[in-house]
Amino acid sequence: MPRPTKFRRVEFFPENNYFVPWGKPKCEMHEVVLKVEELEAMRLKDIEELNQEQCAEKMEISRQTFQNIIDSARKKVAIALTEGKAIKISGGHYTTKLCKLKCIDCGEIYEINYEQDRHLCPNCGSEKVICNKKADFCRRWCKGQNRKEQYEESKNK
């Protein structure tokens, strides 16, 4: 069974997410879809001028995965520029905020995107999970979530 795809950490979101060649009619327009993490990889490497290892660390992925992402991004941009295609920045497998959780029942430690995911252990399905890493960006959310759960439990008793 293949491993699940890790979320790629992204810090930048463009104001404009659609770029078109000048003077080309819409009916003739084809587009290339550039994923958000592909844009982030190009930004870190080409604008911030970080080395591959630093870029991979910032995105919380391996160097090989970073290289695959940036190769794909550069190819898409080159195709769009040479063939006169529009570039649409959309989709991907990314997050801005991750939280490590630990299942009390089975001991599994896993990461979630706390803005989207639910508090269910992917291993056993238990709802008895706690924050395993008190990171600055999720501390208040985790504490608030725990208080909410405690309140609901006391209400049900």
Curated annotation (Swiss-Prot):
Domain of life: Bacteria
Record SUPFAM superfamilies: Sigma3 and sigma4 domains of RNA polymerase sigma factors
Family matches, as InterPro entries: RNA_pol_sigma_r3/r4-like (IPR013324), UPF0251 (IPR002852)
UniProt similarity note: Belongs to the UPF0251 family.
HAMAP family: UPF0251 (MF_00674)
Name recorded for this polypeptide: UPF0251 protein CLK_0815
